[in-house]
A protein has these predicted regions:
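A conserved beta-strand->alpha-helix junction
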Residues: 1-11
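The substrate-binding groove and active-site-proximal loops of carbohydrate-active enzymes
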Residues: 20-22
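Metal-dependent de-N-acetylase/amidase catalytic core
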Residues: 14-15, 24-196
């Protein structure tokens, strides 16, 4: 966090803490990033998309600070990590259909709320905007454990922790990225190397 505090979600009182990352001055945070990376030879910078993935203030700030730092240092090879809005929407719709059969009765309101949230343009990115897809399904159990331990973002009764493994893989088995300097043509396959 470049020695800033976690901001919490946008509606949390912690976002008004002057020591949290959300409140950080972009120039100052960029200088801290520069000090951290001064001995590195940066070939590629990976930051969040402008939405911060799902709207987390710290993720949005990572985008702002990283973009500013790249502009100041002349780094042109940037990738935005994002969420595939279309893929998540399909998985949520499948979960709504199969919830009773999968023993997930009682999470219908959570699923409906998430379906509506995924419809918003401030959540992730449309698949048509995504240029890179990296298969990380070999690490799915580690990802599930990491998400489960991230209590400031995920409640223990969250849909994401209750869905069957195949649906979890649909959402989290691929990492999605955007090259903001190019677009993917219709029907063109996703690139699988961030340096391409």
């Amino acid at each position: 966090f470049l020695n800033y505090r976690d901001s919490g979600m946008i509606d949390s009182p912690t976002t008004s803490n002057p020591e949290c990352f959300w409140q950080a001055n972009i120039e100052e945070a960029s200088l801290r990033l520069s000090n951290l990376l001064c001995e590195e030879s940066v070939d590629l910078l990976v930051i969040y998309d402008p939405n911060g993935g799902y709207g987390h203030p710290d993720h949005i700030q990572v985008h702002r600070v990283g973009t500013h730092w790249a502009d100041q240092t002349g780094i042109e090879n940037i990738r935005w990590t994002t969420l595939n809005r279309d893929s998540i929407k399909k998985t949520i719709e499948l979960a709504i259909e199969t919830a009773p059969d999968e023993g997930l009765a009682g999470i219908g309101d959570d699923l409906e709320e998430r379906r509506q949230r995924v419809e918003e343009e401030s959540f992730g990115s449309a698949e048509s905007e995504i240029t890179h897809a990296i298969n990380v399904s070999d690490f799915i159990e580690k990802k599930r454990a990491a998400i489960s331990s991230h209590r400031s973002q995920i409640d223990e009764d969250s849909f994401f922790l209750k869905i069957p493994n195949d649906q979890f893989v649909n959402i989290f088995g691929t990492e999605w990225f955007i090259n903001p300097k190019e677009s993917r043509k219709e029907n063109e396959t996703f690139k699988s190397n961030l340096f391409d």
